[in-house]
Amino acid sequence: NPSADQNQALRFAAEGGHIEIVIALLKDKRTDPNAYQSEALRSAAEYGHVKVVIELLKDKRTNPCSFDNSAIRWAAQYGRTEVVKVLLADKRVDPSANKNEAILLAAENGHLEVIKVLLRDKRVDPNEALLKAKECNRPQIVEFLLLDTRITQKTKNN
């Protein structure tokens, strides 16, 4: 049974980037891609397995917003720019979820390319990310964010 142990087979295959196994498991209707708060998608996003993320999103049962949009937050945290792009192409994904945590994590960890991609979405607020970049001594990110017209004067002065 592929759904045994909260779909452990799918979760491990996704984490390892084993695309063929993921595809085979998703063909079985007993497989639940949302099991364990969509850990399969979160893990694929965290480890940068773009093809696995794409396959999981093709399956209508996959909820990319599960666990407060954790897939995009984890992809941003670990600098997985291509995964962030794929997730943003899905209209269900909210990059501003959980108080703009995706861009905050990208700023904290120095992932400028991820920040550039996230800021294409008008729902993302760069103000707290600027403060986080200052706090974490990320001068390149600070310089980039200061160019964004959404940055308030109050944030600039902090």
Predicted features and spans:
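Ankyrin-repeat boundary/"N-cap" motif
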Residues: 3-11, 34-42, 65-73, 96-104, ...
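Conserved ankyrin/ankyrin-like repeat signature
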Residues: 20-21, 51-52, 82-83, 113-114, ...
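Ankyrin-repeat C-terminal turn/loop position
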Residues: 29-31, 60-62, 91-93, 122-124, ...
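Ankyrin-repeat-protein effector appendages
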Residues: 121, 131-158
